[in-house]
Amino acid sequence: MNLSKINTLLIASFFLFLTATVISHPQASFEASKTGLSMWWEVVFPSLLPFFILSELLIGFGIVRFVGVLLEPFMRPIFRVPGVGGFVLAMGMASGNPAGAKLTARLRQENQISRVEAERLASFTNSSNPLFIFGAVAVGFFQNASLGILLASAHYLGNLAVGLTMRSYGRKEEQHLRRKKTIPFPSVKDALHALHTARLAEKRPLGKILGDAVTSSVQTLLMVGGFIILFSVFNRLLSVVQLTDVLSVFTKGALTLFQLPTQLDIPLLSGMFEITLGSKLVSETDVSLLQKAIIVSFILGFSGFSVQAQVAGILSETDIRFKPFFIARLLQGVYAAVFVMLLWKPLYTAWHDPYQYVFKSLNSSDMSTAFINGWNLLVQIGPAVTLCALFTYIIIFSYRLTNGTKKG
């Protein structure tokens, strides 16, 4: 039996097992589905939709090309990606997973970047957003806003470290391309010219651009929601059928190798599937805060198989390969964990110096309140935003379907 047939058999067996487990444990599957749906409905959809729509509009109106010309002298020498990568990096950090992959795929579809450049770009522009790191993890799970500064710093430095590491990726594939020896200093005139050229090349009317931005964004988020629910169910079923204990042998071995407490084996395994659940379980473990921070930082950097599956689904619409992205997630997990250890004293221990107690208490309290209020507001208005967006999507889709039928 060749490797291809073995691969097919393994995939078929896995999904057969998953289906049988769902049927045999309907209550656990239902509860896990509700948990995943609630997360998508209340938080993921409303937090990502505005960024997705605005990004589509910025690409459609040529503003991304304007930014790209200005950032070319910085992004090209440092990360070996075009200037538009700076826009993707900023939007990816602000909005969170999987925005970086979504924007990278769009730029590749627009032929603004090569395949190798897209693979480099996707590797370091996907990250958790600050609201999740501070509001959900630091304040929500650990009740410690100061920890958010450490986790966010390590997370985003890990992103940049991955970008620097991946800049050497694909050199052989680019040997045939002729690159300019010197990159000119950014010119506003050239940037405006690129903006105008891109706008003239866009033949769609304003209404069509707006409609496409909404429908494309909603369709992507529907797919993201499906993956969140699927992995929520899968993670729960692993625990129900006690496979978690079997798989935790690997995480326990890794923890022992790095001299970390083996009590973190189940939380680490859960986090490798879904970051929210894993981070919550880590916060409840009875080990030192530094050890918890190291594992949570790795989980945030690795992003979890749930997010990686979302990214794989997005990248599958292009010729961008998933393997470099997966390797980059492993690297970011390791880098982020190392940065936590390096920054522990300057960013956390020093912040909790007893001589700085008054300053610490004031800022920590204000920060906690701000992020708690922000997170609670998102959860409160999230369902309404999701419902309105889905209603708008249905109207646009129905209108286009009706017009298409009439023309046919």
UniProtKB/Swiss-Prot annotation:
UniProt entry keywords in alphabetical sequence: Cell membrane, Membrane, Sporulation, Transmembrane, Transmembrane helix
Positions in coiled-coil regions: none
Domain of life according to the entry: Bacteria
GO CC annotation terms, alphabetical: plasma membrane
TM annotation in the entry: 6-26, 43-63, 81-101, 131-151, 214-234, 294-314, 324-344, 377-397
InterPro entries found in the cross-reference section: Gate_dom, Spore_IM_YlbJ
Subcellular locations according to the entry: Cell membrane
Membrane topology of the entry: Multi-pass membrane protein
GO biological process entries: sporulation resulting in formation of a cellular spore
Conditions for induction: Expression is controlled by a sigma-E-regulated promoter which needs the sigma-E factor for the binding of the RNA polymerase and subsequent transcription.
Disulfide bonds: none
Chief location category: membrane
General function of this protein: Required for spore cortex formation.
Name this protein carries in UniProt: Sporulation integral membrane protein YlbJ
Organism: Bacillus subtilis (strain 168)
Lineage, highest ranks first: Bacteria, Bacillati, Bacillota, Bacilli, Bacillales
Gene: ylbJ
